[in-house]
Curated annotation (Swiss-Prot):
Lineage: Archaea, Methanobacteriati, Methanobacteriota, Thermococci, Thermococcales
Annotated catalysed reactions: 1-(5-phospho-beta-D-ribosyl)-5-[(5-phospho-beta-D-ribosylamino)methylideneamino]imidazole-4-carboxamide = 5-[(5-phospho-1-deoxy-D-ribulos-1-ylimino)methylamino]-1-(5-phospho-beta-D-ribosyl)imidazole-4-carboxamide
Record-given protein name: 1-(5-phosphoribosyl)-5-[(5-phosphoribosylamino)methylideneamino] imidazole-4-carboxamide isomerase
UniProt-recorded Gene Ontology molecular function terms: 1-(5-phosphoribosyl)-5-[(5-phosphoribosylamino)methylideneamino]imidazole-4-carboxamide isomerase activity
Family annotation (InterPro entries): Aldolase_TIM, His_biosynth, HisA_bact_arch, Isoase_HisA-like, Isoase_HisA-like_bact, RibuloseP-bd_barrel
Keywords assigned: Amino-acid biosynthesis, Cytoplasm, Histidine biosynthesis, Isomerase
GO CC terms, sorted: cytoplasm
Organism: Thermococcus onnurineus (strain NA1)
Gene Ontology biological process terms, A to Z: L-histidine biosynthetic process; L-tryptophan biosynthetic process
């Protein structure tokens, strides 16, 4: 199991939102400097372009490029990737994985990008067990398991985000495994060693950790050490 430190970008800065609400934002500073803190412990991080998620088009790829070039870290990046051109640009600047959410349910588009790019990752963002789209602003009628069954023939790498938990430090929901052999990464309120161990028991291949690291609720070193046991 892997730990992916998270950096959320807004206006070129590293920020965190409370439950995905852009009105409730806390600024943490220079994203390149923050990314550099992780280089001794991990080789890959999770980056979300929040401006892109809300506008439908990536706005901070220059910052993502700088992170990659300055730190040497591998990056999985999401936020507003709803066109072939924006996805191509992300790979061009050095991203290892591009995360798509809203456009994943356009199966013709999904087939096209998975035919042309490796590492496409689908984010299943859930509120109340239902998939949320367009920067979490709209809720669909699809349940998470239904969305997974629809998309699994196209991709083998997923991120499951519990929106209610995102950035709230309240721990994880009770989740039963519904996926099979795919790489499944969890995001949303991971804030303790116990959370990470529970996710590993369920069968998640990774956990994305953001606010808990910034607020010193848990250290990256602690999480990595317990996973070695």
């Amino acid at each position: 199991m892997r730990i992916y430190p998270a950096i959320d970008l807004m206006g070129g800065k590293a920020v965190r939102l409370y439950r995905g609400q852009k009105e409730k934002v806390k600024v943490y500073g220079d994203p390149v400097e923050i990314a550099s803190r992780f280089t001794e412990l991990v080789d890959k991080i999770h980056v979300v372009d929040l401006d892109g998620a809300f506008t439908g088009k990536p706005q901070n790829l220059d910052v993502v490029k700088e992170i990659i070039e300055e730190t040497g870290l591998k990056v999985q990046v999401g936020g507003g990737f709803r066109s072939y051109e924006s996805i191509a640009k992300a790979y061009e600047i050095g991203a290892e994985n591009v995360i798509i959410g809203t456009k994943a349910f356009d199966l013709e588009f999904l087939e096209k990008i998975t035919d042309n790019f490796d590492g496409i990752t689908v984010s299943l963002d859930a509120r109340g067990g239902k998939i949320a789209v367009k920067g979490w602003l709209e809720e669909s009628s699809l349940k998470v398991g239904e969305a997974y069954e629809m998309l699994r023939e196209y991709v083998d790498r997923f991120i499951y985000t519990s929106i209610e938990r995102d950035g709230t430090l309240t721990g994880i929901e009770s989740i039963e495994r519904f996926w099979k052999d795919e790489e499944f990464i969890y995001a949303g309120g991971v804030s303790s060693v116990d959370d990470v161990l529970k996710l590993r028991r369920v069968g998640f291949s990774g956990a994305i950790v953001g606010k808990a690291l910034y607020e010193s609720e848990v250290s990256l070193k602690e999480l990595l050490e317990v996973l070695e046991c």
